[in-house]
Amino acid sequence: MFRRLLIATLIGILAALAVAAFRHAMQLLEWIFLSNDTGSLVNAAEGLSPWRRLITPALGGLAAGLLLWGWQKMNQQRPHAPTDYMEALQTDGQFDVGASLVKSLASLLVVVSGSAIGREGAMILLAALAASSFARRFTPREEWKLWIASGAAAGMAGAYHAPLAGSLFIAEILFGTLMLASLGPVVVSAVVALLTTHLLNGSDSLLYTVHLTVDLHAREYVMIVSTGLVAGLCGPLLMWLMTASHNSFLRLKLSPPWQLALGGLIVGLLSLLTPTVWGNGYSVVQSFLLSPPLFSLIGGIFACKILAVLASSGSGAPGGVFTPTLFVGLSIGMFLGRIWGFWLPGSDEIAILLGLAGMATLLAATTHAPIMSTLMICEMTGEYQLLPGLLIACVVASVLSRTLRHDSIYRQHAAEH
């Protein structure tokens, strides 16, 4: 057991380093190509001329598509191992290292160029890949899946500062591939990854800053649970829209470079209306939580952002859908909060409260992982007083969503990409 805990610690450190390497590569490329050192792609877009804002996502998509297409052409005759940690966990615990690195590099290109896709997909993949490489060299074959799971959980913890949610991400989303008794090393890896990330960043701050002073009573619990019901309906709708977008791109019969370029061009066109469509939505989520916008502004940004997410995901841009889902959930929750605010006092507080509820419940509705989703929002914001209400609402959202659509967003995304 001590040996496993030691390996879990080492994997946590490796995963944190992999996440940090991807983050620093993003910052470097943003500085080189966009003259941006703020870490915010929205700020980068605001500083560009309209024509550069239009073509940058398209060029990034084209470059990523050429990279993926070229790799596929070079390796057509070679047997393929998985390039996705979920697939690796469900097979024999091995990765195609070269293809995984190329996929991560392609993800880096589309993320840095402004596509509305999450960066956490590549971060978790690199963390799991680092864990797999270590495990194949130093551990017996029957443990490989455990260490890939530990690496994935540690990658989630490093990316989102949420070690408990990262561990439960493995337990809930990949249920059946691991015994509950194996979660000890997974938790250790996740916590060590978070501590290493804090050490590398020189800070232990929360991922999102929230100023919420509302007291929770029966009325607030009713609003939170009602948000869960709405999210339970919106989750399957979002996944259906993603599938429809993906199928629409496939019907165009474009080669991968042009398909990703088209997705990027759509994002570029939308960014002429509002630069907030660039990136995964992190900075927009933070600004909404600090200063909830009015009803009409939420609607305008939401409409443009959801179209950008559908264009990026549908075109096959390699990346995650986690943070974009958080933004969509936040917008839905704030919509509901503004509606409640027509009749109740403290409309900004209600908007923030239901925005957080929307983030958690839409995440639960799309991942079918209610406990992970609840803990994720609490760990990212520090608002642990919301845990009981969010847990009930997330279970409601997850059950309703699973009833309407069997597959989770991660299963769907893996099948399409």
Swiss-Prot record:
Record-level Gene Ontology MF annotations: voltage-gated chloride channel activity
Membership in a protein family: Belongs to the chloride channel (TC 2.A.49) family. ClcB subfamily.
PANTHER family: CHLORIDE CHANNEL PROTEIN CLC-E (PTHR43427:SF6)
Protein name: Voltage-gated ClC-type chloride channel ClcB
Function per UniProt: Probably acts as an electrical shunt for an outwardly-directed proton pump that is linked to amino acid decarboxylation, as part of the extreme acid resistance (XAR) response.
Gene Ontology process terms (BP): response to acidic pH
Record localization: Cell inner membrane
Keywords, comma-separated and alphabetical: Cell inner membrane, Cell membrane, Chloride, Chloride channel, Ion channel, Ion transport, Membrane, Transmembrane, Transmembrane helix, Transport, Voltage-gated channel
Transmembrane segments: 5-25, 54-74, 146-166, 168-188, 222-242, 258-278, 288-308, 316-336, 349-371, 380-400
Cited NCBIfam families: PRK01610.1 (NF002437)
Keyword Mitochondrion in record: no
HAMAP family, per the entry: CLC_ClcB
Keyword Transmembrane helix included in the entry's annotation: yes
SUPFAM superfamilies with a match to the protein in the record: Clc chloride channel
Domain of life: Bacteria
Membrane topology: Multi-pass membrane protein
Cellular-component GO terms for this entry: chloride channel complex; plasma membrane
Major subcellular location class: membrane
Organism, scientific name: Salmonella dublin (strain CT_02021853)
